[in-house]
Amino acid sequence: MLGGGVGDSYQPIEKKYQLTRRALQLVHEFGFPVHVLTKSVLVIRDADILNAVNQHSRAIVSFSFSSVDDRTSAVVEPRVPSPSERLDAIRFFKSQGIACGMFLLPVIPGVTDSPELLEEAVAKASGAGVDFIIFSGMTLKEGRQKDYFIGAVRDHYPRLAADYRRIYGGSKWGEPVPEYSDSLNRTFGAIVRRYKVPIRMPPALYRDVLGENDLVVVILEQIDYLLRMQGQRSPFGRAAYSISQIPEPLSGLKGGLRDLWGVGETAERVVLEVLETGKSSYHQQLLAGQGIRPEARL
């Protein structure tokens, strides 16, 4: 992964120093796959290297959005390329044969979380040809960032102050109250099913570039997410975390999987199937419930 949730590899200074471009060149030279996450359309500059990576391994380019509305974005995402520019960049990379994702996060309560704006985002992403959408609401942990954000809310959306006190009332980690999160997830889930856009990266984009441990962890995490998006409880997240901490190949531990924290009978069955076949029928069943053909490279 080149990029992240709290920093962008394509800062304006990248135009001058080209550190990210040089990092991509190393990725190419060593034969690694790469997934770029950014808000910047400067990534188009590096299409030559990304195409080269995609020839020998896999290159994926994702853009993050809080909204696809240019006017709203100018307030909540100042000093970054507009959503329209980012959607055009997705179209460009898709025309090059490079898979693309939308990271629709954080969705901001009272600002970008209405059903209308969520549907606009999914519709425009689908129209641009995205291969998947990663979705999340917003956390608001106590500290400087929360103080800054609440100040911006007072300046631009003063009517929302009481809503934020209700939604972010008491969580140590800044998580919204469950009734808000559950409602938001149900709304988004209903919309994205209509457009048949995957809400996690499709297996065809990662199965052939991951080792066995990582493949198991990714599938378990996706199962966990898909179940929680349906409002169900899930043990698969704990199993995924436990397995992610194991340095040795998982295939050598087949007889002792149940000794791992969080791995019960159901998770063990999934793990053994993935080790045997490279896929999980339960995972595929959940993906099919989203209207997605798991084996298709979208």
Predicted regions and their residues:
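Long, highly charged, low-complexity intrinsically disordered interaction regions
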Residues: M201-L298
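Residue-level marker of positions within ordered structural domains that often coincide
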Residues: D8, R193, Y241
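Auxiliary Fe-S-binding modules of radical SAM enzymes
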Residues: E116-R238
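Hydrophobic, helix-prone linear segments
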Residues: V36, F93-Q96, A190, Y195, ...
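Acidic-histidine catalytic/liganding microenvironments
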Residues: H56, Y195, L260
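Conserved AdoMet/S-adenosylmethionine-binding subsite of the radical SAM
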Residues: M1-Y164, W173
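General structural signal for secondary-structure boundaries
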Residues: V36, S82, W173-V177, S181, ...
